[in-house]
Each structure stands twice: as C-alpha cells, then as structure tokens.
Amino acid sequence: MTSTSQLFDPYAEALMAIAREQGLEDRFGEDAALFRSTLAASADLRHLLENPTLFSSQKKAVLNQVFGSSVHPLVLNFLNLLVDRNRIAFLDGIADRYQALLRKLRNVVRADVSSAVPLTEAQVQVITEKVKQLTGAAGVEIESQVDADLLGGVIIKVGSQVLDASLRGQLKRISISLAA
C-alpha cells in the first residue's frame, strides 16, 4: 500500500526544484496557499477535479479559468501535468507538502495555537517569540483556532511538541496530582 507522502512528495519536490531553479520559491508558495484556500472553500471544485468521468481537457479548462490569471505560468503547467498524470485530486496534499518544504528551506516552523478566545496581535507576537526561542527557527507561521473548552490560556503545537498552557490542562494536572 502506498502512503500519501509517497504520492505527494515527488510532485512537491519537483515543484520545489523548478521554483529553486527560477528563484520563485515564495511565489510558488503563495500559489500553493491559493490552491489550498480555494479547494477548502469550494467543495464543487474539489469534486470536479476528483471526478473520473470528466476529460482531462475539461479539468484543464476549469483550472485555467479558476487559476490561470492568478498563478505563475510554470505552476499552471504543473497543474496541467497533474491532470495528465491523474494526480490532480492530490493537489491539496501536494500543495501542503510544498509549503512544508518551503518552511524547511526558510527555517520557519508552523505553530498550531488553540486559545479560549481570539488572540490579540500582541499575544501572537509573544507566542511567536516564544516558539522561536524554543525551536531556534528564523520564523513562525501561526495557525490559530478558538476552542472555548480550554477555559483560558493556550495550547501550542509545533511538530510533535505540545505546550499546554491552558486552564483546562492545568486543572487536569491538578486533578491528577490530587488523585495520586
């Protein structure tokens, strides 16, 4: 059985190689972000691209219409290649993997932050600096979401590391220590 990374990695790495040759790593990263946000926002587009009964020419026409004026021409060629190879359904995963490669190249980490209330800009800055200190990264991409169940504080995930500074986590730790 083939893992998804075995499907995504060669295409993401090929796109990165083209980007590096042309000095367009960040531009292609922006295009990858556009794919991901567009696919997340449009179930119809996802279903259309995944539809095996549509001809490649139809899928290419849709991709050209949706992304043609927004993405770099080399990226549009890449999308057409994915259609030709019947891999366009994996676009989201390939784009995600490309962004991970770009973060690695730029020494940037992604931090998933859950908080009880929306974070202020000042709080985001504090978290960013703390994550930089902990990881030694040059930059941090913060993905935040609100989780009212936390009661207060934050949970920060960077890779496999989790820093639980939430009120819920503190109460759980107190409960465990009292039960012991």
UniProtKB/Swiss-Prot annotation:
One of its GO terms (molecular function) is proton-transporting ATP synthase activity, rotational mechanism. The keyword Ion transport applies. Transmembrane segments: none annotated. Keywords: ATP synthesis, CF(1), Hydrogen ion transport, Ion transport, Membrane, Thylakoid, Transport. It comes from the Bacteria. Pfam families: OSCP (PF00213). It is a peripheral membrane protein. It is found in: Cellular thylakoid membrane. Its main location: membrane. GO terms for cellular component: plasma membrane-derived thylakoid membrane; proton-transporting ATP synthase complex. InterPro entries: ATP_synth_OSCP/delta_N_sf, ATPase_OSCP/d_CS, ATPase_OSCP/dsu. F(1)F(0) ATP synthase produces ATP from ADP in the presence of a proton or sodium gradient. F-type ATPases consist of two structural domains, F(1) containing the extramembraneous catalytic core and F(0) containing the membrane proton channel, linked together by a central stalk and a peripheral stalk. During catalysis, ATP synthesis in the catalytic domain of F(1) is coupled via a rotary mechanism of the central stalk subunits to proton translocation. This protein is part of the stalk that links CF(0) to CF(1). It either transmits conformational changes from CF(0) to CF(1) or is implicated in proton conduction. PANTHER family: ATP SYNTHASE DELTA CHAIN. NCBIfam families: ATP_synt_delta. F-type ATPases have 2 components, F(1) - the catalytic core - and F(0) - the membrane proton channel. F(1) has five subunits: alpha(3), beta(3), gamma(1), delta(1), epsilon(1). CF(0) has four main subunits: a(1), b(1), b'(1) and c(10-14). The alpha and beta chains form an alternating ring which encloses part of the gamma chain. F(1) is attached to F(0) by a central stalk formed by the gamma and epsilon chains, while a peripheral stalk is formed by the delta, b and b' chains. Belongs to the ATPase delta chain family. This is ATP synthase subunit delta. The gene is atpH.
